[in-house]
């Protein structure tokens, strides 16, 4: 009787239902597209959150029908994805009719997170792919920031982007996309030597 009970208890432990085992986390549904590509010309691996809309309601108390989007890229030297050299952030301003371009003195970039304001310097305009064209409906500004600063932004509950006098707050799905992008960096585990 004892041996039957012992065999049954061992079998119960070995064949536990799948519900008792820890489940892997489901991917976050934020609507953003994240891609990883190796750039052979610059000898780096780029993990990029493709252009993602933040707001199409205009800026705070200004310019209705204006859309703001972001694109973020993590630049990792070589073919590895466990060290990020720097992060490039692009802020895209679009309008149906025209965009009031930011003059050089109105390109100061700062990000307000839960607890602090991060002043990240001056943004620069991104060159268009088509030479000889001038699109008055789109303005793309870019800034390079340290990875440590990006980690602070991705870990925040609320994030507001400020370019000059214009400010826009990221939505929950935008913050979730930044967290997802940051989670793709492989963090080396600490090994203990005995």
Language-model features and meaning:
Residues 1-4:
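Positively charged n-region of N-terminal signal peptides that target proteins for export
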Residues 13-19:
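C-terminal segment of classical bacterial N-terminal signal peptides
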Residues 21-102:
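An ectodomain-focused feature that recognizes extracytoplasmic/extracellular
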Residues 22-38, 49, 113-132, 170-172:
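Short, surface-exposed loop motifs enriched in S/T, G, D/E and P with embedded aromatic residues
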Residues 89-130:
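Mid-length scaffold segments of soluble, non-membrane domains
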Residues 122-194:
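Internal interaction segment
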């Amino acid at each position: 009787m004892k041996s039957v009970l012992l065999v049954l208890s061992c079998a119960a432990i070995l064949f536990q239902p799948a519900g008792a085992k820890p489940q892997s986390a489901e991917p976050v549904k934020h609507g953003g597209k994240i891609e990883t590509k190796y750039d052979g010309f610059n000898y780096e691996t780029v993990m990029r959150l493709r252009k993602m809309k933040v707001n199409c309601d205009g800026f705070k108390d200004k310019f209705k029908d204006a859309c703001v989007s972001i694109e973020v890229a993590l630049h990792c030297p070589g073919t590895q994805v466990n060290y990020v050299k720097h992060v490039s952030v692009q802020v895209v301003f679009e309008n149906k009719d025209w965009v009031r371009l930011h003059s050089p003195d109105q390109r100061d970039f700062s990000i307000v997170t839960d607890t602090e304001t991060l002043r990240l310097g001056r943004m620069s305009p991104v060159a268009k792919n088509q030479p000889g064209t001038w699109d008055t409906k789109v303005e793309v500004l870019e800034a390079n920031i340290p990875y440590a600063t990006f980690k602070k932004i991705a870990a925040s509950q609320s994030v507001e982007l400020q370019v000059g006098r214009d400010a826009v707050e990221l939505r929950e799905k935008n913050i979730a996309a930044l967290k997802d992008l940051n989670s793709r960096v492989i963090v080396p585990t600490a090994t203990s030597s005995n």
